């Protein structure tokens, strides 16, 4: 079959936007479905806006009809014809009331039989879909996500441009500096044995831009981190990156709140109430057992240490004596939902997180308590009262150090919330998490390590603790959390040269290391720096939530898989020996 050309024709309308008025149109797209009914043929033509039905009648134009008989699924077509009402209306389609009676059909490209049905691929193996990603990207669901992501990027630029931000590009090849994850390294051909690093973030460059006087910076920045993947993480991602001078934390948060309000109203029609609620890190952990709390439902953690301190139960007593606590969550209706076997699974899950075990009170017809023999008169009633329990509830209790108890109950809270169906769909609960810990304790190496990049400003009232009490140092850093997912992180930056030196020293860096890794930035601060701070918002993750997608793969055109490879192009791959020689690189074989 000889293929046609577009000569003499140009598209007048997208398929999903063909008007209902009678007029001549030219549409282009992929053949979605072909129905041959003898003397009639109907072809659903698909493009990124939707479908339109093409109609062919052998009595009207035999030549065009015969060409339509050649069409198969996924052929690329161009069709000219008159819009007319359909005999049978399809209410599911935007163009379901009309069809195009075709007078000129062009077959521009043929398709072999596809390895899966493009528009019905939900049950198709993910590996197969990723291998043929260009076909899966034709799926209307996936196209809708990609187009929504485009709209998010468009609104993002509009908002920040309107608020005086300058979009400035920062280098993609930079010096390797410690930022938490492993760098992707790029060997230099010109400088043998030396490497560039792909940016984990534009952090250093955007701070230099503030020192340079560009007081409002924005960039949709590509970032790279060589770390293990999960459902909400990719080795390369896009960050809505911003920095502001002559501001404080509240100014930056107010700017972001305005952006969130505009974005959710324009994309989803959702009204976001401002200002967004705030929780300190300590309060978030105490109430929800997480620094990324899902606040769409209750089931908050209750501290019952004082209530149970006199109960002669060694699990409780040893935890309290060791400076820990006894805390609980009340799973409303959980006694009815959870069987004893399912409760045992919760216990095992708690152990998997790090807890030694889990006590419980299952109040069905009668209270069934896992530590009943240790209870004195009135103890059970006191516990029930402390957590607001009533008949039908399940109380889960954990006793240990707070760093074990809180994340354990926080994880169980989410599991039980999903199991009971109490987490509302279609609800968007934002919360700022503030006053983040400045240091984290590394049990393995028995030392305090930085919880943030080394340019994060400590809170003024905590400066005296830097040398004496690292556990009490809080940072001028914050996260924006939506429905239990961290959307963004931000902080105020250190602008005092001496404090920055002290911070490097607190992180165990020698003068030589400081000079080698950050010498150019330290030098820049010698020439004065305005007060500044900024944030990074994950565009991929934001898109995933707005699109209600299950994975970042559903909002990224060409994603990587769990082992950081791309199945479609089979990368990473080996390269020619000549290329390696030019880069002064030799490879060694690794036994698998």
Q: Model-found features: residue ranges?
A:
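Class II aminoacyl-tRNA synthetase catalytic cores and aaRS-like
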Residues: 1-592
């Amino acid at each position: 079959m000889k293929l046609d050309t577009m000569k003499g024709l140009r598209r007048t309308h997208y398929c999903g936007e063909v008007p209902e008025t009678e007029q001549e149109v030219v549409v282009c797209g992929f053949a979605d479905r072909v129905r041959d009914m003898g003397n009639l043929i109907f072809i659903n033509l698909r493009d990124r806006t939707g479908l339109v039905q093409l109609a062919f009648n052998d009595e009207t134009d035999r030549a065009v009809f015969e060409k339509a008989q050649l069409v198969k699924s996924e052929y690329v077509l161009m069709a000219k014809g008159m819009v007319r009402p359909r005999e049978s209306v399809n209410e599911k389609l935007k163009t379901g009331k009309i069809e195009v009676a075709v007078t000129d059909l062009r077959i521009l490209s043929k398709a072999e039989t596809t390895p899966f049905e493009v528009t019905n691929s939900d049950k198709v193996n993910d590996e197969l879909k990723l291998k043929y990603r260009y076909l899966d990207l034709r799926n209307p669901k996936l196209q809708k996500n990609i187009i929504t992501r485009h709209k998010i990027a468009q609104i993002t630029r509009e908002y920040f441009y309107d608020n005086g931000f300058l979009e400035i590009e920062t280098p993609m090849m930079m010096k390797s500096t410690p930022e938490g994850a492993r760098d992707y390294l790029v060997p230099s051909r010109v400088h043998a044995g030396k490497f560039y690093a792909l940016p984990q973030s534009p952090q250093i460059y955007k701070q230099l831009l503030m020192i340079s006087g560009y007081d409002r910076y924005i960039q949709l920045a590509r970032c790279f981190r060589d770390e293990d993947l999960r459902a909400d993480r990719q080795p390369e991602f896009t960050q809505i990156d911003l920095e502001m001078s002559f501001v404080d934390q509240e100014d930056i948060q107010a700017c972001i709140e305005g952006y969130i309000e505009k974005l959710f109203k324009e994309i989803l029609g959702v009204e976001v109430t401002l200002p967004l609620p705030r929780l300190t890190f300590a309060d978030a952990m105490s109430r929800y057992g997480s620094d990324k709390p899902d606040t769409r439902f209750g089931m908050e953690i209750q501290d019952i240490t004082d209530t149970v301190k006199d109960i002669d139960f060694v699990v409780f007593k040893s935890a309290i004596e060791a400076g820990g606590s006894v805390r609980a969550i009340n799973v409303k209706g959980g006694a009815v939902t959870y069987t004893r076997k399912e409760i045992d699974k919760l216990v095992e899950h708690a152990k998997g997180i790090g807890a030694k075990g889990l006590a419980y009170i299952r109040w069905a017809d009668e209270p069934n308590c896992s530590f009943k023999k240790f209870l004195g008169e009135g103890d059970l009633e006191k516990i029930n009262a402390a957590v607001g329990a009533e008949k039908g509830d399940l109380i889960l209790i954990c006793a240990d150090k707070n760093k074990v108890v809180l994340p354990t109950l926080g994880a169980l809270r989410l599991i039980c919330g999903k199991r009971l169906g109490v987490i509302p769909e279609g609800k968007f609960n934002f919360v700022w998490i503030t006053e983040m810990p400045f240091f984290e304790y590394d049990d393995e190496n028995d030392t305090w390590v930085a919880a943030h990049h080394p340019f994060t400003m400590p809170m003024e009232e905590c400066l005296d603790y830097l040398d004496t009490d690292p556990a009490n140092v809080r940072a001028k850093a914050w996260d924006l959390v939506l429905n239990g997912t961290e959307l963004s992180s931000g902080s105020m930056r250190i602008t005092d040269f001496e404090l920055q030196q002290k911070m490097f020293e607190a992180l165990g860096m020698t003068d030589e290391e400081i000079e080698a890794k950050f010498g150019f930035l330290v030098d820049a601060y010698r020439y004065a720096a305005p007060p500044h701070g900024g944030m990074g918002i994950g565009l991929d993750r934001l898109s995933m939530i707005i699109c209600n997608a299950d994975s970042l793969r559903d909002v990224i055109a060409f994603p990587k898989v769990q082992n950081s490879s791309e199945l479609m192009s089979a990368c990473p791959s080996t390269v020619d020996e000549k290329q390696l020689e030019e880069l002064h690189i030799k490879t060694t074989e690794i036994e698998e």
